[in-house]
From Swiss-Prot:
InterPro entries: Kunitz_BPTI_sf. Disulfide bonds join C90-C145, C116-C141. Coiled coil: none annotated. Glycans are attached at N57. This is Haemaphysalin. The keyword Glycoprotein applies. Interacts with host coagulation factor XII (F12) (inactive and activated) (via fibronectin type II domain). Interacts with host high molecular weight kininogen (KNG1) (via amino acids 421-466 and 459-513). Keywords: Blood coagulation cascade inhibiting toxin, Disulfide bond, Glycoprotein, Hemostasis impairing toxin, Protease inhibitor, Secreted, Serine protease inhibitor, Signal, Toxin. Residues 90-145 form the BPTI/Kunitz inhibitor domain. Anticoagulant protein. Inhibits activation of host plasma kallikrein-kinin system by interfering with reciprocal activation between coagulation factor XII (F12) and prekallikrein (KLKB1) without affecting their amidolytic activities.
């Protein structure tokens, strides 16, 4: 979650302001808040739920889900992981271990961009470490680091829009 702050600039051509966001570490108590998806529009009936992140204590992973309660969720997968699972391999620096001869494509998770990116590295012996941010395949990286998504169910239409 980011807290907005307004900065005012005085220039030769006039005055203007802009809103900037300061990153803050969420309250660890949010890691225990049950994930409950919105089942339609928010309380006033007009606002759509926001797609935010919650922490699943069983899987030890973050989940993206629609919610009307912004204060009870994390703004990003990165903040969710940093708050609830600091030891996640998805937050670790990429593996730099022992190399063999040859080059291979591996994948690293970029928590700021919330995506798995390919990297060319010298080939490792057999597999990558289960504690480091380096994966043998994009699928393995996504399964480990990308948040799962809980769909919103539209009761009136009987559909899952998104």
């Amino acid at each position: 979650m980011h807290l907005p702050a307004t900065i005012v600039f005085f220039t030769c051509t006039g005055v203007f302001s802009t809103t900037v966001f300061a990153k803050y570490r969420a309250n660890p108590a949010l890691c225990k808040v049950p994930i409950k998806s919105a089942t339609g529009n928010c309380r006033n009936g007009n606002d759509l739920p926001s797609w935010l992140y919650g922490y699943n204590n069983i899987t030890k992973k973050c989940v993206q889900y629609p919610t009307c309660f912004k204060r009870l969720a994390f703004e990003s997968n990165e903040i969710c992981l940093e708050t609830c699972n600091k030891q996640s391999r998805c937050l670790q620096p990429p593996e730099t271990g022992i190399f063999d001869i040859g080059w291979s494509t591996y994948y690293v998770y970029n928590s700021r961009k919330n995506m798995c990116k390919p990297v060319k590295k010298m080939k490792f012996r057999k597999t990558t470490s289960k504690q480091k941010n380096l994966f043998n395949s994009e699928e393995e990286c996504q399964q480990e680091c990308m948040p799962s998504t809980t769909p919103i169910y539209n009761v009136a239409q009987g559909t899952y829009p998104r």
